[in-house]
């Protein structure tokens, strides 16, 4: 084992490395692992041999898909790193890792600056209020420009960067950094062997003025954050390195600003100072403080847990992974208390007991067994049967439910048909395991065709899931064409609609009458349905009310136009009637279901389609073709801007029009343009498109 798990939480950092696809995140993580002594053979993403990219496809595709948790040590501090993917189809991985991090390193490409995916990941980090430091990577690349990248952090992210280093040289002549906190040059001149220690030098004469200018900006920012420091600064006294670092740390932990460093991970330059900055400026579990949750069965009663060994045990499961030998691994962040292997805990989310088999701290896909799990750390557990992503584990005598995670619904679906009978059986196992691991992966049975339909966040996401079925579970299957996950909704209010369910066939019959109102609705937290009971005076017995709600929700699975799920509506149960003998839960469920269907037909039903936020980067000369093409795909151009010599077009385009776009774009621009897209929102489809969708769905 590397070193004992540190119990002094001041010396622990739980961080993520977040970036755009090719900003060099995996290489940066690799270097961190090398310099912290975990990894003795360096893996390059270019060769497909990186430590954190441990699934076969990640090695092939050179992109990080699964956030592996890695533990390492630096100057007597423990760093637990969650590697996050930089591809938009894997937003679920980013979301779930950000939920359990205390801080993050945002890696930017020194030539490209802030790219579309960086913006999205940055927004997700802001959602969970994760403090960040910025590492401007690839300073050795042709066209790398540190000052341009810092400006893009201001312009594109609306963030406040605090420059702590200036680059010495650029491109092939990038030799190191000027440290503005200690006012010294830290250099790695020429070609540097991995692990080489930097040389400390005087600041080069040609950078002296620039260093003085940026040092002054740094000191002003530091002085403004603290009255004592301001008095000292205006009295002309020197601020000590400790005072400067303390002030930067405080502002970083409060997300008031974001320290910026630079380097070239690939060329082994700038990694050690970045690790120092992780320790100096990013928060430890004690800085984050207590975590909030609610009592079991009562969301109004707020409970808290402090990051201490002496508190009752509480943890959040943030990832499930399949392991070739151990089966199901559950990654957890422990927020309070301690637990031993073999102990029984409560899954408060599901109300079930679980027994922990073994405990590990992970290093990519190697396991280090530990004999206790303590507050503030990240572990992998074996033996949990019912726990899934977002579940709370806690002490049985002190239950608490921690805030879970919200995951978007899939926007794209494909049908999948096993080739043989044995493939059919294996497919069942594969789907169950993959669905456990990935909350944005959905599975349903198309009742008309009998086909299994799987859904995900994009074409690449589904490609990789199908690929994993083949490799890991040996399932051979035919995969259909991608289909868009449409939705249906209503546009008008129906004040009153009544429905009576009556059946008389010898003996006791069935009777239920409901009167409902239906109206468009969107909840604050993104909820797409609300049920309100307005029945008074026992017109419908209390025990039958939930059946009406359940029936309505069943009916919402299949909309009234083309059979797509109904969303964004509120159902109010106004009145009704029952029969002492013939009424039952089942009768009211049927009545609720039929009433909703009939009312929805009167409520101006429409079809919704997913719109994607598309960003195309293209050379100037192809701009007209690109815009014309997006318009022909029903795209709405949102903005155009210039970025590092190229033009950028931002548009909202229906997902149904984006299949095969990459090939068309390449042929129109001779392979010189690229694009990214992320799900944006659902919007009503135009009438002519709606007709086509309905005709296709109903076979007319």
From Swiss-Prot:
Pfam families: EFG_C, EFG_III, EFG_IV, GTP_EFTU, GTP_EFTU_D2. Its main location: cytoplasm. Residues 10-286 form the tr-type G domain. Keywords: Cytoplasm, Elongation factor, GTP-binding, Nucleotide-binding, Protein biosynthesis. GO terms for biological process: ribosome disassembly. It is found in: Cytoplasm. The keyword Ribosomal protein does not apply. SMART domains: EFG_C (SM00838), EFG_IV (SM00889). PROSITE patterns: G_TR_1 (PS00301), G_TR_2 (PS51722). GO terms for cellular component: cytoplasm. It comes from the Bacteria. Gene3D superfamilies: 3.30.230.10, 3.30.70.240, Elongation Factor G (Translational Gtpase), domain 3 (3.30.70.870), P-loop containing nucleotide triphosphate hydrolases (3.40.50.300), Translation factors (2.40.30.10). One of its GO terms (molecular function) is GTP binding. GTP binds at residues 19-26, 83-87, 137-140. SUPFAM superfamilies: EF-G C-terminal domain-like, P-loop containing nucleoside triphosphate hydrolases, Ribosomal protein S5 domain 2-like, Translation proteins. Coiled coil: none annotated. Catalyzes the GTP-dependent ribosomal translocation step during translation elongation. During this step, the ribosome changes from the pre-translocational (PRE) to the post-translocational (POST) state as the newly formed A-site-bound peptidyl-tRNA and P-site-bound deacylated tRNA move to the P and E sites, respectively. Catalyzes the coordinated movement of the two tRNA molecules, the mRNA and conformational changes in the ribosome. HAMAP family: EF_G_EF_2_B. Belongs to the TRAFAC class translation factor GTPase superfamily. Classic translation factor GTPase family. EF-G/EF-2 subfamily. PANTHER family: RIBOSOME-RELEASING FACTOR 2, MITOCHONDRIAL, TRANSLATION ELONGATION FACTOR G-RELATED. This is Elongation factor G. It comes from Rhodococcus jostii (strain RHA1). The gene is fusA.
